[in-house]
Amino acid sequence: MDIKHHQNGTRGQRRKQPHTTVQRLLTWGLPVSCSWFLWRQPGEFPVTALLLGAGAGGLLAIGLFQLLVNPMNIYEEQKIMFLYSLVGLGAMGWGTSPHIRCASLLLVPKMLGKEGRLFVLGYALAAIYVGPVANLRHNLNNVIASLGCTVELQINNTRAAWRISTAPLRAMFKDLLSSKELLRAETRNISATFEDLDAQVNSETGYTPEDTMDSGETAQGREARQAPASRLHLSTQKMYELKTKLRCSYVVNQAILSCRRWFDRKHEQCMKHIWVPLLTHLLCLPMKFKFFCGIAKVMEVWCRNRIPVEGNFGQTYDSLNQSIRGLDGEFSANIDFKEEKQAGVLGLNTSWERVSTEVRDYVYRQEARLEWALGLLHVLLSCTFLLVLHASFSYMDSYNHDIRFDNIYISTYFCQIDDRRKKLGKRTLLPLRKAEEKTVIFPCKPTIQASEMSNVVRELLETLPILLLLVVLCGLDWALYSIFDTIRHHSFLQYSFRSSHKLEVKVGGDSMLARLLRKTIGALNTSSETVMESNNMPCLPQPVGLDARAYWRAAVPIGLLVCLCLLQAFGYRLRRVIAAFYFPKREKKRILFLYNDLLKKRAAFTKLRRAAILRRERQQKAPRHPLADILHRGCPLLRRWLCRRCVVCQAPETPESYVCRTLDCEAVYCWSCWDDMRQRCPVCTPREELSSSAFSDSNDDTAYAG
């Protein structure tokens, strides 16, 4: 069954018979000299290959530098060093090694694969951060600032209202303090006026202190017999009455004494003028009648009984004296405010300004971390090129060393081999059976084939989280913007504080006390009218909404990521084309191996497929959920997915499908698969009766290299 490859043609003949579609197209579209150069043998055109390869490699290195290194935040000297290094390595590699050229071109299909998606994923995350995330951060910071401004506005309004309400009281005290000197002058005048009365009350003129003590002791003795001992102290009233009585006694005594002196003086004068001895004593005898002076004692009794002192004089004097002494003190007034701060949670005592500052600092720190992470992401994106380059070299090495690696393509050379065998009358493979078509890939088909579909679906599912992240962030950004914009339009508040008062105290009269009261209580005569207007317009949030262009900028990388998932199958086909272009002999060996391997499997097709057929038949015979039967009967659109399938190729059952007639079998086959099974059901046919082969199921089958 093996086919041996004979290399017995000339170089010109090989050029006239291209084995690949790319070779056929380039031979048709390029001049003959270019075709000779592209499909030259090793050692041909060395100088031309070196110069053209070095130029192409240098240009490719410059392009990679502009794409990867230039956006990095590094010094210009380092960028220049990277540029020279990349250009030198690119020129040397492209000029001397076909492996370097192949690996470099493999970067294009690799960028369409999972490595390229990783690169685009970084840009998608950066676009999401610059778009919805940055706008969310801006709006949240704006709301935090709005809350702080609102609280500060409330505090300022409360403080202003308090100051306005207490302004009249503070103005009154200020007026009192400003009239302090005038009040002092008035009090000095009052004190000077009171000094005359005080001197008169405290004066000891008109009596002797000894008389006071004697009279006091006499009065105390007399009152001691009438009152308890605790009341022996004389009050101001009694002391003044006592002094008045003593003055009366003193005046009467002085009058009696003066009267007696007058009699003595007249007696002496009489004795001097009359010299007759007997006649002198007789005529001067009346001058000895001093006892007539005692008549003045009658006045003393009258004075004691009718003292000209009011009954409440002492109490009035004491009160007035105390008031006058109080006026001599310092006049001052102080306004003290006591502020009580209550501790917050767990005994903390933190002001709103500090909390707002801490929150703002926390937001700034998070922004700095995000900026640092974004810079690191840019560096990692540049470093992902190394992963892409490594994947390119890895594919090239696996292509050259593992003949089964990614060897599932039905190429032009495969068809040429089949045509040649058909002309020779040998067994051929084309057209492939349905079950075989699901294990290989036709590179020229513009659709995604069965071998590629599972990998594409898996990559699309891996893209789903980043897509959901974008949708959630955009939805959250739009929702928050709508909420904040509604708050801004419907939360306008106008603060209005009005205060007015009028206090008037009238003090009539022109006395000293009236003037004093007018200067003190008159300070209460104040009036004020205050209007304070304020609003919260400066504190309302000012959210920013993303426009359609911003949403597109965030969604385009995600869309590109989805497109890369769909283009991955075609990119993987392209990498095989590039490797076959640089290693045509290796490609021929791989195609020959694939053809021989499919021939062997075709010979043992029934036996190799028997295990899978039995498994699928058991799954079909298993009882289905009643809901599946209901949907199958009631929903025609779902019948294609709920109906039975061919146990070989898994095609949906049709009216033309063949159902095994063996009892308890009922395996479903499409007619082409039934013919491939040689019209014998592997389910109900013993294994020994099937076509024998030395080959069985193996894990060494060629597989799709994802």
Curated annotation (Swiss-Prot):
Positions of the UniProt region annotated as Disordered: 1-20, 204-230
As recorded in UniProt, its EC number(s) are: 2.3.2.27
Membrane-topology annotation of the record: Multi-pass membrane protein
User: Induction of this protein: by what?
Assistant: Induced by IFNB1.
- UniProt entry keywords in alphabetical sequence: Cell membrane, Cytoplasmic vesicle, Glycoprotein, Immunity, Innate immunity, Membrane, Metal-binding, Transferase, Transmembrane, Transmembrane helix, Ubl conjugation pathway, Zinc, Zinc-finger
| One cellular component (GO) term of this entry | acrosomal membrane
A GO molecular-function annotation: ubiquitin protein ligase activity
Positions with biased composition (Basic residues): 1-18
Disulphide-bonded residues: none
Q: Give the enzyme's main class according to its UniProt record, as a single word.
A: transferase
| Alphabetical GO biological process terms | fusion of sperm to egg plasma membrane involved in single fertilization; innate immune response; negative regulation of type I interferon-mediated signaling pathway; protein ubiquitination; sperm-egg recognition; ubiquitin-dependent protein catabolic process
Tell me, how does this one assemble?
Answer: Interacts with STAT2; the interaction results in STAT2 'Lys-48'-linked ubiquitination leading to its proteasomal degradation. Interacts with DCST2.
PANTHER family on file: DENDRITIC CELL-SPECIFIC TRANSMEMBRANE PROTEIN, E3 UBIQUITIN-PROTEIN LIGASE DCST1
**Under which name does UniProt file this protein?**
E3 ubiquitin-protein ligase DCST1
Q: What is the lineage of its organism?
A: Eukaryota, Metazoa, Chordata, Craniata, Vertebrata
